[in-house]
């Protein structure tokens, strides 16, 4: 028996972009890890911030790169007629400075995240691994296991931002630790930069949506919007 429309809506968080919501089968799903990867300045952080801004519930935001901007979040809120202070108060920010701190922070989320939270973001999961030249993907897998536990036990959506590298074999940009993250992330979005302000989202993997779907979106003061 199919659930009601409200039940279905309650299991996803809107992205605020109609095209992206449709691409993801309604929005960012709770109880699942969504991986978003792509080159620098493609809108990945703005995407994660916007999902937190537009949905009820607190957000646990693990910022490993210093990319989270309170000023940008306030701008997005004001541009949408929302209270900037109220928007900022929803976000609980963690700033691990190295791999060890990142491991401790993610583990600590098991006791911090409760029913008041709707979203957990790690932006990005692989930055410190890349910076420190670590190939210890076993530790990365353990952190993903904790994030998967949070998604399922705490009924939250989890967004993991990932960086890219140039793969000489395929002559293309691929996500770091692709196989390790791919094992735990059921839904995968790739962001690409087309021209100033305009971006492309490609659905590389999904639990029930067809792979390869694409959506164009733009970056504005509001955050991300459909590109017409």
From Swiss-Prot:
Pfam families: Rad51. The keyword DNA damage applies. One of its GO terms (molecular function) is ATP binding. InterPro entries: AAA+_ATPase (IPR003593), DNA_recomb/repair_Rad51_C (IPR013632), DNA_repair_and_recomb_RadB (IPR011939), P-loop_NTPase (IPR027417), RecA_ATP-bd (IPR020588). One of its GO terms (biological process) is DNA repair. Keywords: ATP-binding, DNA damage, DNA recombination, DNA-binding, Nucleotide-binding. Signal peptide: none annotated. ATP binds at residues 38-45. Involved in DNA repair and in homologous recombination. May regulate the cleavage reactions of the branch-structured DNA. Has a very weak ATPase activity that is not stimulated by DNA. Binds DNA but does not promote DNA strands exchange. Belongs to the eukaryotic RecA-like protein family. RadB subfamily. This is DNA repair and recombination protein RadB. It comes from Pyrococcus horikoshii (strain ATCC 700860 / DSM 12428 / JCM 9974 / NBRC 100139 / OT-3).
